[in-house]
């Protein structure tokens, strides 16, 4: 199964309505601090694992979400590129319900993104 692209508004709806859904934000620590992060009422549904230059990404991911092989996992970055790569990587190790939030946190050339779509976020 391949990674599916999904817009931020649909991903948010699925995240808040499904107890088995998780958000993995793969941006850098600097991006989280300077631009903001998504806000979900259930903090246990959010993982912050920087993808860039992180040789421990797989180990860190598995240490947190190892027992949730059937979970629905949404990957988020600034504009949808890094998150797509991370989602593919995790799909290749056995997780089949991976989605790339294609418009990202800040948007891309075609779409607004999490923040500009007025979805909950915070610093």
Curated annotation (Swiss-Prot):
Provide the disulphide bond pattern: none
Which PROSITE patterns does the record cross-reference, listed alphabetically?
RHODANESE_3
Gene3D superfamilies hit by this protein: Rhodanese-like domain
Q: Which residues form the Rhodanese domain?
A: 17-117
PANTHER family, per database record: RHODANESE-LIKE DOMAIN-CONTAINING PROTEIN 4, CHLOROPLASTIC
Which protein, by its recorded name, is this?
A: Uncharacterized protein RP600 homolog
Organism in which the protein naturally occurs: Rickettsia rickettsii
């Amino acid at each position: 199964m391949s990674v599916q692209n999904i817009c931020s508004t649909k991903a948010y709806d699925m995240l808040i309505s499904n107890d088995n859904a998780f958000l993995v934000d793969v941006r850098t620590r600097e991006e989280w601090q300077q631009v903001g992060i998504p806000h979900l009422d259930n903090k246990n549904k959010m993982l912050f694992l920087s993808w860039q230059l992180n040789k421990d990404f797989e180990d860190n991911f598995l240490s947190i979400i190892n027992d949730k092989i059937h979970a629905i996992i949404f990957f988020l970055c600034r504009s949808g590129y890094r998150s797509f790569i991370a989602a593919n990587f995790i799909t290749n190790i056995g997780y089949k319900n991976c989605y790339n939030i294609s418009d990202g946190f800040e948007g891309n050339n075609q779409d607004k993104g999490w923040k500009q779509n007025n979805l909950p976020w915070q610093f």
